[in-house]
């Protein structure tokens, strides 16, 4: 490796926008490392990070309020390029001597920005740009040294620039896909203005991660809880590439997995990739612990506690394991820091954001803690994991434990597994699986009368659920074809003895959540 992939970096200061993580993902997509910190970060931390450029995010506050957040003064004293987005532009304008006012005309949705003059931020772009606006306040007077480089019919300063100091502000959101050339604008800033190179690629991330794992663990042995999910699977492949047979994976089959999932994990990681895997069949133990529990939160906690106990027991059998590998990813780190302090912080190493025992005397290996989920999937492909596994729909940590409503019984799980497998199989066959964001089946603990042949049956009900969403914060129910739903229903009722009725969930989020529990 000729250059360190972290040498060139962008700092993003978070003012609370729902899109802030998306800004970071776009910068990474461009091929440059970045980190996301709270707006009130200390000057010393910025100096230590030594960014090549700083982006000020959007946010829900109003710059016109006395106690609204401001960028640290050092941002404008540091000599590095700065891009303000939405609220970020407004606080930049106000802090540097311009004026912001609350507007009677709020701009939400698509807008056409008329580009004026020559600005690095709009390099190689046409004179009119389709963008996405989401603001009430607006800049009414730009600071000295700035020029107007974009306007809309209702926003006189939709973009401003101080080319000499390399300060730029845009009132719209270049990070969202609704802004047609938003990625190009961010590239113009990150690559053009800041002078960064595209060092952050899947290949270089893998090379860097493997080197760091080798340096961290040396000749020691490592243990990993392998679930078959995306994060733990990619960690397994990275650590195995770094240290080979010194990695031992523990796969706990809790009886709450999808149909044949346990065998699929063993076949792929054991037989195909040659990893050392200990499989623990703990179905009876989990179901016993869940007896009589119907509250969703109590079920989640019980499943988590039993997993920790089982994993702890297995890890103690591996006397030489000095390190624990975990699938912590960057959003986990951000959310963990925010939940403890109310704000996102600098990435600190060895912060256990999982629920494993505090007394587990092992060092932590977390090779994904700098990565977003989409980056994890990309390096998974590069490491040889199958697309179907990396891009399948989300599956909750407690598994079927929160898809069997109420008390969990083996009979219910077995029925649900088979019904869900039919639904997913038919989605693939109809080329609909990748057109919905998430699809699954829920077991309802209610019986319903049905007719089979000349006889009546009194059996269980399942609900099909399919949603379309961009960020899983909000979701629409998927309008699947009636013929398709009819086929799935017929197959489930005919092939799964014990189910007499199939319903389809047409609730959006909000008011409903995506999962039922």
Swiss-Prot record:
InterPro entries (alphabetical): Class_I_gatase-like, GATASE, GMP_synth_C, GMP_synth_GATase, GMP_synthase, GMPS_ATP_PPase_dom, NAD/GMP_synthase, Rossmann-like_a/b/a_fold
Keyword presence, Secreted: no
Catalytic activity: XMP + L-glutamine + ATP + H2O = GMP + L-glutamate + AMP + diphosphate + 2 H(+)
Segments forming domain Glutamine amidotransferase type-1: 9-199
Positions of the GMPS ATP-PPase domain: 200-392
EC number(s) stated in the UniProt entry for this protein: 6.3.5.2
Gene Ontology MF, one: ATP binding
Pathway terms, separated by semicolons: Purine metabolism; GMP biosynthesis; GMP from XMP (L-Gln route): step 1/1
Binding residues for ATP: 227-233
Gene Ontology CC, one term: cytosol
Pfam families reported for this sequence: GATase (PF00117), GMP_synt_C (PF00958), NAD_synthase (PF02540)
Keyword ATP-binding appears in the UniProt entry: yes
Active site: 86, 173, 175
Keyword line: ATP-binding, Glutamine amidotransferase, GMP biosynthesis, Ligase, Nucleotide-binding, Purine biosynthesis
Subunit comment: Homodimer.
Xref: PANTHER family: GMP SYNTHASE [GLUTAMINE-HYDROLYZING], GMP SYNTHASE-RELATED
HAMAP family recorded: GMP_synthase (MF_00344)
Role according to the record: Catalyzes the synthesis of GMP from XMP.
Designated name of the protein: GMP synthase [glutamine-hydrolyzing]
Source species of the chain: Vibrio vulnificus (strain YJ016)
């Amino acid at each position: 490796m000729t250059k360190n992939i972290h040498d060139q970096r962008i700092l993003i200061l978070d003012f609370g926008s729902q899109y802030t993580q998306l800004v970071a993902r776009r910068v990474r997509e461009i091929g440059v490392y970045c980190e996301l910190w709270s707006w009130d970060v200390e000057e010393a931390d910025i100096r230590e990070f030594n960014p090549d450029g700083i982006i000020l995010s959007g946010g829900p506050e109003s710059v016109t309020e006395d106690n609204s957040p401001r960028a640290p003064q050092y941002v404008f004293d540091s000599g590095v390029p700065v891009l303000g987005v939405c609220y970020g532009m407004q606080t930049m304008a106000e802090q540097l001597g311009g004026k912001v006012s609350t507007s009677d005309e709020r701009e939400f949705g698509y807008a056409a920005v008329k580009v004026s003059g020559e600005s690095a931020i709009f390099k190689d772009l046409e004179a009119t740009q389709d963008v996405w606006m989401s603001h009430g306040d607006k800049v009414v007077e730009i600071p000295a040294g700035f020029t107007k480089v974009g306007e809309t019919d209702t926003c006189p300063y939709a973009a401003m620039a101080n080319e000499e100091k390399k300060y730029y502000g845009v009132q719209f959101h270049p990070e969202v896909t609704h802004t047609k050339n938003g990625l190009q604008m961010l590239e113009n800033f990150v690559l053009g203005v800041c002078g960064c190179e595209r060092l952050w690629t899947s290949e270089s991330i893998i090379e860097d991660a493997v080197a760091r794992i080798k340096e961290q663990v040396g000749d020691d042995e490592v243990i990993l809880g392998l679930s078959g999910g995306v994060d733990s699977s990619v960690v397994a492949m990275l650590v195995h590439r770094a240290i080979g047979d010194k990695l031992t994976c523990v796969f706990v089959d809790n009886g709450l997995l999808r149909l044949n999932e346990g065998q699929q994990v063993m076949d792929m990681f054991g037989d195909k990739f040659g990893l050392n895997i200990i499989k623990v069949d703990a179905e009876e133990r989990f179901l016993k612990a869940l007896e009589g529990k119907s509250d969703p939160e109590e079920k989640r906690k019980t499943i988590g506690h039993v997993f920790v106990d089982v994993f702890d027991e297995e890890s103690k059998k591996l006397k030489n394991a000095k390190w624990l590998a975990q699938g912590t990813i960057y959003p986990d780190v951000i959310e963990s820091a925010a939940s403890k302090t109310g704000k996102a912080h600098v990435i600190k190493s060895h912060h256990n954001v999982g629920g494993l025992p505090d007394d587990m005397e092992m060092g932590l290996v977390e090779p994904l803690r700098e990565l977003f989920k989409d980056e994890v999937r990309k390096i998974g492909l590069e490491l040889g994991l199958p697309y179907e596994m990396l891009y399948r729909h989300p599956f909750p940590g407690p598994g079927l434990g929160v898809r069997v409503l109420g008390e969990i019984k083996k009979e219910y799980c077995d029925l649900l597994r088979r019904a869900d497998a039919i639904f997913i199989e038919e989605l693939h066959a109809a080329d609909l699986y990748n057109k919905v964001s998430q699809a699954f089946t829920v077991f309802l603990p209610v019986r319903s009368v049905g007719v089979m042949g000349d006889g009546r049956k009194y059996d269980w009900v399942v609900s099909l659920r399919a949603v379309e969403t961009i960020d899983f914060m909000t979701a629409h129910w998927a309008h699947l074809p009636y013929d398709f739903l009819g086929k799935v229903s017929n197959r489930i009722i005919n092939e799964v003895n014990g189910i007499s009725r199939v319903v389809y969930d047409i609730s959006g989020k909000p008011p409903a959540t995506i999962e039922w529990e």
